[in-house]
Amino acid sequence: MSNIDWTTLYCIVDAFCKEFEPHWFKTLLTTSVRHRNREAGLCLSEVMTIVIAFHYSKIRTFKHFYLQLLAFHRDLFPGMMSYSRFVSLKKMAMIPLIAFTRTHMSKCSGISIVDATPIVVCHNKRIFSHKIFDGLAKRGKSTMGYFFGFKLHLIINELGEILAFKLTPGNINDNKVVGELSKNLVGKLFGDKGYISMKLFKELFKRGLKLVTQARKNMKPRMMEIADRLILRKRSLIESV
């Protein structure tokens, strides 16, 4: 955790929350059901700071990260509570975290890489007994086989910086999402063989975006610029984001 600049990170997040929260609260629905309004020990900006800092750390699981923070760095967040209490509190930060990510995405440089990765919510044998994401998660297929859950569609630039992202049910075809995700991009978009589609190529080309993919084994050889071949070899960069 020594590599994390906590003060700078918190100031950035807190400045965002001061702008975001007033607008967010106006959109929240009210209910006649009365709830206990017990004050949380941490404010929204503190919760978001802890969640974001975890992704900058080298610790594998969030539980170990939080317990270490609780044991050795409690002075940074005096209002810290138990791990189980924080997990229940973390839910309130989901929408603000998505908004924060969207406001801090990078700009298109002319070279973009697209890919999708499965987010599995349970083992295939437990699909019918799964309740948490019932009605939301769907069966899908990836290069690793069939899964039950969601798909994270991601576009980055050549530096590994996020340009666009979207979470969909697992049964959504990757090509159906590319058009929406790439609406603000120009130049070249590099993808794997799963994005081969003449319809998608023409759609993107009309907007000034050229889709570049590798050819399948059963396809005829085609001419490709050397620079494009080299960038396709670096496409694995997106898998490390």
Question: Where are the model-predicted features located?
Answer:
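Short alpha-helical elements
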Residues: M1-V241
